[in-house]
């Protein structure tokens, strides 16, 4: 294949632009349009005569998932072995961007070795609710922490010359109906909570691609949302890379191209090409729109293809396993350690109980699932830990069924040990792409086991595996609680390193753990019965809500214990940042995460009680003191003013609060900040509950005042965007039967305790996705025929489906021949 030689050898943007302009002039409209959609599930189209290679994209937020055979977007089919690193939710608890960059570098190295040009991650959606089934893939409830950690991953991945792909842009915080839901959110909340993390990534790490989300935002699909993609992403932030759709996430391909979306994935086939050509020919969009997107794509293709071609096809798997173990260890959070039960002394007699000890839960389910090169188990690593094992008992059924015999065996074993290491957690069904959690509870059989074991042996250490927070009413039944999250393939060894004191735990929570789900701010507006998702809580997500509204929590944001203690002193502050002294006052070395929160108690523009605006992680020997500096950036004091439509600063006195967690503030200083003298954006509006933070009482009128417009009507329409699960709303017996069959399959899989992810995806999939995810076998004309069928025009609908099917076959064949021979 002829290649543009200097684009492959010389990293000079100006030369590549000249070559790309030359290529663009040689391509006809059909060729251009064909390049803007995928060739297969994970590859782009190649044009040999023009010297345009194909590149491979692959899932990989916590490890590379390149599928060797039949490809799918849900992680159902096997993939090439790779290192499974701890998930983003886990590594976020390290609060260590340097560590994140190391992980990203290793993942990028493995991706390039497997000839992957674009690694689809990291994910940094804001954790609006603890029930989001994909929270294990996301960093935090706080956009600043999410942005800083995600930026570190992107820098690491792209240090190999390939592209990272931060996702899902934006306001995509639930799995239910994720391809059809409409996130109704006010502009200030959108900017401050749901876009700030992405802004940090774009400006600080310069990703080459970004993935748009499935959902609508205020009535417009994210992938064709001009305000999101052109005004903000490309305009305000200066992003000049490629925007890639989520798989099947394109609604109107032409509008996507016009409004800033570059590449439609996976492989919609010839119908997408014709759709784009017709849009140009009809004047709906211009050829200049197509050229702009193609220029972005060619830059990505030539840049990353060159990097992949020159990269080694091998990597040091042992070194990456060691990194995965270190990352997991630095991310483990010690939540309770009564009477300093940990660390365990060498030779301590321990009983290991819990199914997770023999079959670890170390990653989430769905498209992020990695085919791990190897997986350490707790039982195997125990042999090298220096502890004396008195035996193992599974203790409980993993899927939650009562088992008295297993529990009795575990209790008997517990009585023989000095300490019980009880491995509990959420099973694979509880947390998955495509599914939201139904509750925040640990399985009843695990709680009953804990109570029984604790009665037999009070020295019970709960080792918890879960990708998101849990309710902990059972906390009093254990002396120690250690949260390992989802620790990746080396997580078991990392946990034993912490339990035995080889590693002093330094992780701190990146999300609040509440006492009960009923305490969460979005409880009444998360994953409801309709398509519309009202973000009524506004700015008050996570600790921003709990601390403003005075809601007690189990474990606050930023919380985590250590085997040593730290003292804070000598705080000096101004509007540019703080310096202070931190001293290790304990008897062992350890790391402390110093957190900087900004507050304005006398604010005239309502805001949360305090917000994270900086942090630093430092390692100190016993008795060692060190000066810590934390700088404040341009986001420290700003708020989005909906009246001036820009970032503003309210002038006056601010508190800079430095602490070991959001609830453990050690030092406070006041600084004076010059304001921008902007008008009050909420003057004359009745926003009582937003001012107080008591947002669970927000009225319809208040929310509409915050939005600046009425809440749209939530209706199911019989059109291309009706989901397969909504076909019972139509007027077609065939649709009713199809919906009932899907519902039966779905319910049956749940009843068996093994939800079928493919059926879940299909049930929540809009009809248009049939034309976007079948490699050209289904056209949008066929979908329109199906819509006619569902509207009750049965014969006309069926005949149109048949006609469009034949037409699509002929047109696809003709187009492919033209593309091959041109």
Predicted regions located by residue number:
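Generic surface-pattern signal
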Residues: 29, 41, 281, 299-302, ...
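C-terminal non-catalytic accessory extensions
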Residues: 754-822
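Terminal connector regions
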Residues: 634-681
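Long, charged, low-complexity terminal extensions
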Residues: 715, 719-776
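Glycoside hydrolase catalytic-domain context in secreted enzymes
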Residues: 2, 7-635, 639, 653-657, ...
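Enrichment for repetitive, rod-forming helical segments
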Residues: 10, 39, 174, 712, ...
């Amino acid at each position: 294949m002829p290649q543009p030689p200097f684009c492959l050898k010389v990293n000079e943007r100006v030369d590549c632009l000249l070559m790309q302009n030359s290529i663009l002039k040689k391509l006809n409209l059909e060729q251009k349009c064909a390049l803007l959609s995928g060739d297969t599930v994970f590859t782009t189209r190649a044009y040999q005569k023009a010297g345009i290679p194909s590149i491979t994209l692959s899932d990989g937020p916590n490890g590379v998932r390149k599928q060797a055979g039949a490809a799918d977007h849900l992680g159902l089919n096997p993939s090439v072995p790779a290192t499974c690193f701890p998930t983003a939710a886990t590594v976020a608890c390290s609060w260590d961007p340097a560590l994140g960059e190391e992980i990203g570098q290793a993942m990028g190295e493995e991706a390039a070795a497997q000839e992957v040009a674009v690694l689809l991650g990291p994910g940094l959606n804001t954790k609006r609710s603890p029930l989001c089934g994909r929270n294990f893939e996301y960093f935090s409830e706080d956009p600043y922490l999410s942005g800083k950690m995600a930026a570190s991953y992107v820098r690491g991945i792209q240090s190999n010359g390939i592209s990272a792909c931060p996702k899902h842009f934006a306001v995509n915080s639930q799995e239910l109906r994720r391809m059809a839901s409409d996130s109704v959110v006010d502009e200030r909340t959108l900017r401050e909570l749901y876009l700030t993390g992405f802004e940090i990534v774009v400006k600080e790490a310069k990703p080459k691609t970004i993935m748009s989300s499935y959902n609508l935002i205020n009535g417009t699909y994210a992938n064709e949302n001009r305000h999101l993609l052109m005004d903000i992403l490309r305009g305000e932030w200066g992003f000049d890379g490629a925007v890639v759709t989520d798989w099947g996430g394109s609604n109107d391909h032409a509008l996507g191209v016009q409004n800033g979306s570059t590449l439609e994935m996976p492989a919609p086939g010839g119908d997408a090409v014709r759709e784009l050509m017709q849009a140009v020919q009809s004047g709906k969009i211009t050829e200049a729109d197509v050229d702009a997107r193609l220029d972005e794509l060619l830059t990505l293709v030539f840049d990353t293809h060159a990097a992949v071609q020159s990269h080694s096809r091998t990597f040091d798997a042992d070194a990456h396993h060691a990194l995965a173990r270190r990352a997991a260890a630095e991310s483990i959070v010690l939540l309770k350690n009564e009477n300093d039960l940990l660390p365990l002394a060498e030779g301590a007699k321990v009983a290991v109980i819990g199914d997770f000890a023999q079959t670890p839960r170390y990653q989430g389910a769905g498209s992020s699932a990695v085919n791990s090169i190897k997986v350490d188990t707790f039982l195997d690593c125990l042999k090298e830990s220096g502890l004396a094992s008195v035996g193992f008992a599974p203790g409980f059924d993993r899927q939650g069924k009562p088992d008295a015999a297993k529990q009795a065996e575990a209790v008997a074993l517990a009585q023989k040990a000095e300490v019980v290491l009880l491995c509990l957690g959420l099973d694979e069904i509880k947390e998955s792409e495509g599914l939201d959690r139904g509750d925040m509870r640990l399985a009843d059989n695990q709680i009953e086991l804990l109570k029984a074991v604790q009665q037999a042996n009070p020295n019970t250490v709960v080792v918890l595996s879960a990708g998101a927070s849990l309710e902990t009413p059972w906390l009093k039944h254990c002396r120690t609680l250690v949260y390992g999250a989802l620790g990746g393939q080396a997580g078991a060894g990392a946990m034993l390193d912490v339990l035995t004191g080889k590693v002093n735990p330094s992780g701190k929570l990146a999300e609040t753990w509440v006492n009960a789900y009923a305490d969460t701010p979005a409880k009444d507006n998360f994953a409801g019965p309709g398509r519309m998702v009202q973000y009524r809580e506004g700015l008050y997500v996570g600790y921003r809500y709990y601390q403003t509204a005075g809601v007690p929590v189990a474990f606050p944001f930023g919380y985590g214990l250590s085997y040593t203690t730290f003292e804070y002193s000598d705080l000096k502050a101004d509007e540019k940042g703080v310096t202070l002294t931190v001293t290790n006052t304990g008897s062992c070395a350890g790391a402390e995460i110093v957190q900087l929160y900004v507050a304005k108690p006398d604010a005239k523009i309502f805001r949360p009680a305090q917000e994270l605006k900086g942090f630093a992680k430092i390692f100190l020997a016993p008795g060692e003191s060190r000066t810590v500096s934390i700088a404040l950036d341009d986001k420290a004091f700003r708020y989005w003013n909906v009246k001036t439509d820009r970032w503003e600063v309210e002038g006056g006195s601010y508190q800079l609060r430095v602490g070991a967690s959001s609830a453990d503030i050690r030092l406070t200083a006041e600084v004076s900040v010059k304001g921008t003298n902007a008008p009050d954006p909420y003057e004359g509006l009745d926003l009582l509950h937003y001012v107080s933070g008591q947002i669970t009482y927000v009225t319809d009128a208040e929310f509409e005042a915050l939005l600046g417009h009425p809440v749209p009507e939530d209706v199911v329409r019989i059109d291309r965007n009706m989901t397969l699960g909504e076909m019972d709303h139509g007027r077609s017996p065939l649709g009713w039967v199809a919906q009932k069959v899907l519902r039966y399959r779905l319910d049956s899989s749940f009843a068996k305790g093994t939800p079928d992810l493919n059926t879940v995806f299909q049930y929540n999939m809009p009809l248009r996705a049939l034309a976007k995810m079948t490699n050209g076998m289904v056209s949008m004309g066929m979908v329109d025929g199906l819509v006619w069928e569902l509207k009750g025009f049965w014969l006309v609908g069926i005949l149109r489906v048949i006609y469009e099917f034949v037409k699509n076959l002929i047109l696809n064949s003709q187009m492919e021949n033209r593309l091959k021979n041109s």
